Amino acid sequence: MRVDGRGKAELRHIHIHTNYLKHPEGSVLIEVGDTKVICSATIEERVPPFMRGEGKGWVTAEYSMIPRATEQRTIRESSKGKVTGRTMEIQRLIGRALRAVVDLEALGERTVWIDCDVIQADGGTRTASITGAYVAMVLAFEKLLQAEKVSKIPVKDYLAATSVGVVEEQGVVLDLNYAEDSKADVDMNVIMTGKGQFVEVQGTGEEATFSRAELNELLDAAEQGIFQLVEKQKEALGDIVSHIE
């Protein structure tokens, strides 16, 4: 039995609150257990200079964490005057993952700004951000469709992410919380599409190694978890799903 009573292959409770904010074109509050992230999507009617004239859009992301999202207060990065390497890595990961499933040509010369703000952290903040950001982005695209600025919702597939790991005395477990993540022998983040294609796999042994058999078991667990997350995304999107499938 895991520390929170879940089975080894069981996700934490997932809830996606849509249209959580008033102003953005798309927004959600995603709850993955005690991890909570506000994700918003903003449409800008222009692209970065390096993309001008190509007839394609762009998706980029920013990620941050409020000071008391964690057990001990952390200083705001804006107070330090620079973004940490961890934050930069996560921002790039989110943007890169979303671009993998966006039809950039169908989007046209527009930029989608994704903002992910962690308001409570209990492990898996980057994977929750990706799963929530996808829904916020599709909500924003639906606004473009309603305004007849695009001919279809410009996504090629669903996108979700989760964590898996090898935890002492438990073996392979799905969707690690902070207590599990902090003592995991192997920690892995997996991003996949709704059709089961891999977008990114980040796996690391923490003073440990893992076998090919364990790698396969980790990926199998992640795949099943991601398919469940995609179903949660579909529930949150409601009728919009008909424009994707």
Swiss-Prot record:
SUPFAM superfamilies: Ribonuclease PH domain 2-like (SSF55666), Ribosomal protein S5 domain 2-like (SSF54211). Disulfide bonds: none annotated. It catalyses: tRNA(n+1) + phosphate = tRNA(n) + a ribonucleoside 5'-diphosphate. Keywords: Nucleotidyltransferase, RNA-binding, rRNA processing, Transferase, tRNA processing, tRNA-binding. CDD domains: RNase_PH_bact (cd11362). GO terms for biological process: rRNA catabolic process; rRNA processing; tRNA processing. Phosphate binds at R86, G124, T125, R126. InterPro entries: ExoRNase_PH_dom1 (IPR001247), ExoRNase_PH_dom2 (IPR015847), ExoRNase_PH_dom2_sf (IPR036345), PNPase/RNase_PH_dom_sf (IPR027408), Ribosomal_Su5_D2-typ_SF (IPR020568), RNase_PH (IPR050080), RNase_PH_bac-type (IPR002381), RNase_PH_CS (IPR018336). Its EC number is 2.7.7.56. GO terms for molecular function: 3'-5'-RNA exonuclease activity; tRNA binding; tRNA nucleotidyltransferase activity. It is an enzyme of class 2 (transferase). Belongs to the RNase PH family. Homohexameric ring arranged as a trimer of dimers. Phosphorolytic 3'-5' exoribonuclease that plays an important role in tRNA 3'-end maturation. Removes nucleotide residues following the 3'-CCA terminus of tRNAs; can also add nucleotides to the ends of RNA molecules by using nucleoside diphosphates as substrates, but this may not be physiologically important. Probably plays a role in initiation of 16S rRNA degradation (leading to ribosome degradation) during starvation. This is Ribonuclease PH. It comes from Bacillus mycoides (strain KBAB4).
